[in-house]
Regions:
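Membrane-proximal intracellular helices of multi-pass ion channels
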Residues: 1-503
């Protein structure tokens, strides 16, 4: 056994192969650890899925550990290869989650299992499961997959991308007199993010427990709120007003940037006051709640509470379900769809295009209009004291194009597969923004389980790319396409040389 996991003595691997293998191993270890914890929980609760979860998790965990020990890292990894490795790790978690759904018999069709696993790890509030029929172990696995997916998004946005000189302006890295940055280095950033995320989840669990959600319900709701995943367990716990208030506070915090939360914890109030993105976040929530209440004819305190809950669920892309308050005007679901598309603050667990990038686009449009009047104008784009480099501005424009392209492409595919235009557009936006739930024009909640399997399967790529913040996923796709193209070109040249020799 010792020799099995001993480091190989082979020469160092290439940058891409090392990153891909490490990513696959890390993804497998994360998913198998979650499955093992869920299996042990189900075993204690005398559930029927315990041994399937435990056996599948142990086998995949050992295989992942063996692969991790066999990898020999090169002296330097290329940035594109690291992003490819991150994408492979995420895909590995999704695929192993699919396997566990099938092994436990929770889902028998691989397409359903892939959709459910992708929705969980991408924190998309869509599900085809009957939660009342799930055992405790699988309930914990489904909610836990969201929590892991939310942590992946935070580590990617706050620790990994800034360390690779991508979106460095979005990270709190600079030290100074009296300043304690969130991310002075990649390792410190990961540790700070993990502590904040885990502590926030723990506080949410205590809050839900005090509000009366019950032990299991509190764990499920805490994981879903912190990760903005929107999965709700059996028994309709969100029908309780006290539980709703905890969810409202939790969604508000989950939609805020980790930098803001760090500054609150470390009592750095000046940085919070200077944050233009945080002010925009507060303005969006306030104006959106008033508009939604007006368009849904909200009356008493209960209806306004439910209106605020619904608006927060959309803006933060959490996707907790709430029935429409009163008769909805046609503009109400459009408002929620736009709110989900824009999303919360950058550096949060929420999805969507996100507010910092939206502010960057607005500032860019203003600058280009001013240049039409003053062609020699030299102006930098500044957001709340942060000066964006031209590379970051170009990346924001690229991400806007990619987001719109994914929404349009997904809408077209699911429309061809049978959804009407309004539902197809809503499904495309929510998949790309990792949000939910999808609503009809009258505000009625639509169940993903009622859609055909091809429709649900068509949403999976948008969910995965959306959770990976577009850029890393597209870099990975480009790297894979380049590798395939190079191999085909090499094979073509080899065949041409072989034909020359035969002559």
């Amino acid at each position: 056994m010792r020799n099995l996991f001993r480091r190989t003595s082979n020469p160092d691997w290439g940058s891409l192969s090392s990153a891909v293998a490490t990513g696959a191993a890390v993804g497998g270890l994360c998913a198998s650890t979650l499955g093992l914890a869920s299996g042990l929980f189900d075993l204690v609760a005398s559930g029927a899925d315990a041994w399937s979860l435990l056996s599948g998790s142990v086998v995949t965990g050992l295989a992942s550990a063996w692969l991790f020990r066999r990898v020999r890292s090169p002296r330097r990894h290329e940035t594109a290869d690291i992003l490819t490795g991150v994408t492979v790790a995420f895909l590995g978690m999704v695929l192993l989650g699919t396997l566990l759904y099938l092994l436990t018999g929770t889902l028998t069709d691989p397409r359903d299992a892939l959709f459910e696993s992708a929705a969980g790890f991408s924190t998309t509030a869509l599900t085809s499961l009957d939660v009342d029929a799930l055992g405790r172990g699988m309930l914990l696995f489904r909610a836990g997959s969201q929590w892991v997916g939310g942590l992946t998004a935070l580590l990617l946005g706050v620790a990994i991308l800034p360390a690779l000189s991508v979106d460095r302006e979005l990270a709190d890295r600079h030290t100074g007199t009296g300043r304690r940055p969130l991310a002075p280095s990649g390792g410190r950033a990961a540790g700070n993010v993990l502590r904040l995320y885990a502590g926030f989840t723990l506080l949410l669990g205590i809050g839900y427990l005090v509000a009366g959600a019950g032990p299991l319900g509190s764990v499920l709701l805490a994981a879903s709120t912190a990760s903005t995943g929107g999965f709700v367990g059996p028994g309709q716990p969100l029908a309780d007003p006290a539980v709703q208030w905890v969810a409202i506070l939790g969604m508000f915090v989950a939609g805020a940037s980790m930098v803001i939360l760090w500054r609150i914890v470390t009592l750095q109030w000046q940085g919070i006051r200077r944050s233009a993105e945080f002010r925009t976040y507060l303005l969006l929530l306030s104006a959106g709640t008033l508009l939604l209440g007006w368009w849904s004819e909200a009356g008493g305190p209960d209806e306004w509470r439910e209106t605020l809950f619904t608006l927060l669920s959309a803006v933060t892309t959490t996707g907790f379900p709430m029935e429409a308050v009163g008769p909805w005007a046609t503009a109400a679901p459009v408002l929620l769809l736009l709110a989900a598309a824009v999303g919360p603050m950058t550096g949060s667990t929420g999805g969507g295009f996100q507010l910092f990038r939206m502010l960057g686009l607005v500032k860019l449009a203003r600058r280009e209009l001013m240049r039409q009047l003053h062609p020699s104008l030299i102006a930098r784009i500044r957001i709340g004291g942060v000066v964006l480099s031209e590379a970051s501005v170009g990346r924001i424009v690229l991400q806007q194009f990619l987001f719109v392209a994914i929404v349009v492409g997904t809408t077209g595919v699911v429309g061809i597969l049978g959804l009407d235009l309004a539902t197809a557009l809503a499904a495309g936006v929510h998949a790309a923004a990792t949000a939910g739930p999808v609503r009809a024009l009258d505000g009625t909640l639509l169940e993903a389980a009622s859609w055909s399997r091809p429709v649900r399967l068509a949403l999976v790529p948008a969910m995965l790319i959306g959770r990976l913040a577009l850029y890393p996923a597209l870099v990975a796709i480009g790297t894979a396409a380049t590798g395939i193209q190079n191999r085909l070109r090499l094979k073509w040249r080899w065949n041409a040389l072989a034909k020359e020799r035969d002559r």
